[in-house]
Design a protein with these regions (language model features):
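Catalytic machinery of carbohydrate-active enzymes
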Residues: 1-337
């Protein structure tokens, strides 16, 4: 891109799911500034993915020490890449700035428009709308059109290759199962997963488990279920994870960033919820269904942590398969029961 191109900068320090929930808002900004280069300051993994999908033009890892001065209010022009702030017309940041220090620092660079807002809120029916509220009245755009992530062909091929390495070719419909979440208090029991995996096989589906670096406990628990020849993949990056998910004809998971990723890729998705509010946090789309146990009666997250019953997570496996079968896939049905 030309060195003189004007830029807009988006700052999002949240995790995978939080960043993915904000891409509708990014699309509104893109529509309002079609000639600008969009730069995202976020986690390196999700930033790389969104760059591959064309949601943004460039990403910079928010973990970088080079950017720490910006958030501490000590940034100097020599500390940041020239094209990050020198030709910037807009900064939108989803972060807290209680003392106004970050705003003042950005304005000292001569940026004409700075919009900063914490994503935390109890208002609004869905978290994606919280990000859109940041832009309310600022830019025109259709905030209701659901987005999909589209991976380039070489990335898709890497997912096919990863499955082939563990002996999975195109054949039975592939169901990706993600056993983890950002909190163990949002995960169903291992024996529920055991029943789900056995149920996939009984329905002539091919279950594949994907695990992240924080899912060691989930891995030990599922291995204790005595499931023979269970395919397990540990993608080395979020982009590789997306490449694998994109091969699937169905996905089962918890309230997690991976579940949002599957849904954004257009994969028929069943999300198992418990203590969190699906009206606020579930992925959206006709290809998404939510199942849960009983309504959670815990008053706050401390009560959730202390709860041993977790009746809200007592999901019935047959309801998962009914949901998977009932989803309007738009491509094809994955169950034959």
């Amino acid at each position: 891109m030309p060195g003189s191109q004007r830029t807009i900068v988006v700052i999002h320090p949240g995790g995978l799911g939080d960043v993915l929930l904000s891409i509708d808002a990014m699309a509104v900004m893109r529509s309002a500034f079609p000639q600008h280069k969009m730069i995202l300051l976020a986690g390196s993994e999700v930033g790389h993915l969104l760059g591959q999908c064309g949601v943004i033009d460039q990403s910079l890892p928010i973990e970088s020490s080079r950017l720490s001065a910006l958030f501490s209010g000590r940034a100097q022009r020599s500390d940041l890449q020239q094209d990050l702030l020198w030709r910037c017309d807009l900064v939108v940041g989803w972060l807290s700035d209680h003392d106004g220090l970050i705003r003042r620092t950005l304005q000292e660079f001569g940026i004409p428009r700075v919009i900063l807002q914490s994503p935390a809120s109890t208002e609004g029916p869905h978290q994606s709308e919280r990000f859109l509220q940041t832009l309310q009245g600022e830019f025109p755009g259709d905030a209701r059109a659901p987005l999909r992530l589209h991976l380039p062909q070489q990335v898709l091929q890497s997912g096919t290759d990863a499955l082939r390495v563990i002996g999975i070719e195109q054949g039975a419909p592939l169901i990706v199962c993600h056993l983890g979440s950002g909190s163990r208090h949002k995960c169903v029991r291992a024996d529920t997963w055991g029943t789900l995996i056995q149920g996939c096989r009984a329905r002539q589906l091919m279950p594949v488990v994907v695990l992240g670096s924080a899912d060691e406990q989930a891995e030990m628990a599922i291995r204790g279920q005595g499931l023979p020849e269970l395919p397990i993949l540990r993608p080395r990056s979020v982009t590789m994870l997306a490449a694998i998910l994109a091969q699937a004809q169905g996905y089962i998971g918890h309230d997690s960033g991976v579940t949002h990723l599957a849904a954004l890729l257009g994969v028929p998705t069943v999300a198992m919820f418990g203590p969190t509010d699906e009206q606020r946090w579930a992925p959206r789309g006709v290809h998404v269904a939510v199942v849960r146990g009983e309504n959670c009666m815990c008053a706050n997250w401390d009560a959730v942590r202390a709860c041993t019953e977790k009746s809200c997570l007592k999901v019935k496996p047959n309801e998962v398969f009914e949901a998977l079968d009932a989803i309007d896939f738009r491509y094809h049905r994955v169950t034959n029961s």
